[in-house]
């Protein structure tokens, strides 16, 4: 899978750095261990965060800033990581979908980064381009219907949008039959200290029998993900 970062994203977020991980998987309906970790994090968040202070989490704050730079109101179109944590702080349970989706959600709330998971066999073409949504661009968010993605960062394949930090697209969503997974990790803050993935990857292998096949860096400023993904890959392989 080839990933391109557009000039527009480079101009509004010169520090952007991200990663693409491609894995063959065996999905499952539910993982008790995974939900134990989600519940543990929920308890921690309720003790340490409010719906205002969660906006200061580095990955969330940076994503909100990119929204503003692109002309989108981040309080109306919240990044998914922020929306998920807000739901927890409001005393609500996260939706249980399947192990892969639940794991991506866990990574998102744990680190605050925009992390998208996709069924790679549903992509059209072999290239994804990260750009900015256009006026009137069609986009169906998962479980949300039509979303106005004008001003949102968006990944597009050969047909159209597949993922934004607010919602991924119905067309390429993970389902119970997904066996070819692509994960896109987006560091709009470029902050190495808070970077996700090594512990998440080891849990991932345990819960979904993953076999990592490719991990690449897509960046406009090289500074973050190579060491992290190499370590994650080796941990998965050694199991």
Locate predicted features.
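Charge-biased, low-complexity intrinsically disordered regions
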Residues: 1-229
């Amino acid at each position: 899978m080839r990933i391109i970062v557009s000039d527009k994203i480079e101009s509004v977020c010169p520090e952007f750095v991200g990663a693409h991980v491609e894995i063959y998987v065996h999905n499952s309906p539910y993982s008790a261990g995974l939900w134990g970790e989600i519940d543990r994090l929920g308890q921690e968040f309720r003790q340490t965060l409010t719906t205002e202070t969660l906006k200061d989490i580095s990955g969330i704050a940076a994503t909100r800033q990119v929204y503003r730079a692109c002309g989108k109101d981040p309080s109306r179109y919240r990044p998914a990581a922020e929306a998920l944590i807000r739901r927890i702080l409001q005393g609500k349970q996260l939706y249980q979908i399947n192990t892969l989706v639940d794991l991506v959600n866990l990574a998102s709330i744990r680190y605050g980064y925009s992390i998208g998971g996709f069924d790679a066999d549903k992509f059209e073409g072999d290239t994804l381009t990260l750009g900015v949504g256009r006026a009137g661009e069609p986009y169906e968010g998962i479980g949300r219907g039509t979303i106005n993605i004008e001003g949102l960062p968006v990944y597009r394949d050969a047909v159209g949008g597949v993922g934004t930090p607010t919602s991924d697209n119905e067309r390429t969503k993970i389902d119970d039959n997904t066996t070819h997974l692509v994960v896109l990790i987006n560091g709009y803050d470029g902050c190495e200290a808070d970077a996700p993935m090594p512990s998440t990857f080891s849990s991932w292998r345990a819960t979904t029998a993953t076999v990592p096949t490719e991990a690449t860096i897509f960046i406009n400023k090289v500074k973050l993900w190579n060491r992290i993904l190499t370590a994650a890959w080796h941990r998965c392989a050694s199991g």
